[in-house]
A protein has these predicted regions:
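Mature catalytic core of soluble alpha/beta enzymes
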Residues: 1-165
Length: 165
């Protein structure tokens, strides 16, 4: 009898659970320094069946400055789109943030000339907090529309968790 199944497509994860089963995930904020930053256990009763992470340090390009935004949603497609949107909105204006046209960073980028983040300096706590709050507003809007269940936002050792309560 199969208790659970999952498919991991480079961090976008879809899963199925049988009655009485659970799926535990670990979240890593910085892929350059992989360490387990938090864990989440998703029981069968949870509406979550997909998760995804996005951020400027990841394999995909980002318009924002989040180290990582992990989203739990009813499907991995919803989680992927939401994580990208929220991570793009974890942002502030700062002269030390370096952005380049996406096509200059990756030849095959579908973002063309859109500026993507390539370097984020150490920011003051208030600046990090403001950037995270900007992303949190996007997460709250998606929760209100029942598109996602929760979002974990991380930047320079600060985290914010937004949940559907």
């Amino acid at each position: 009898k199969i208790r659970r199944m999952y498919v991991n497509n480079g961090g976008d994860i879809s899963f199925w659970l049988n009655y009485g089963s659970a799926f535990t995930i670990g979240v890593v904020d910085n892929p350059q320094r992989p360490e387990l930053n938090t864990k989440v256990c998703l029981p069968y009763e949870s509406p979550v069946r997909g998760l995804a992470t996005s951020g400027w340090r990841g394999r995909s390009q980002s318009l924002g400055i989040a180290d990582a935004v992990t989203v739990l949603a009813p499907s991995s497609a919803c989680a992927d789109a939401a994580a990208t949107l929220i991570a793009n909105n974890v942002n502030i204006e700062h002269p030390g943030i370096i952005r380049k046209p996406a096509c200059d960073v990756k030849d095959d980028s579908d973002l063309g000339m859109h500026p993507v983040t390539v370097k984020v300096p150490f920011l003051h706590e208030k600046e990090v907090s403001q950037a995270l709050q900007n992303g949190a507003e996007s997460a709250k809007a998606l929760i209100r529309k029942n598109k996602i269940q929760s979002a974990y936002l991380s930047m320079q050792k600060q985290t914010l968790v937004i949940e559907n309560t």
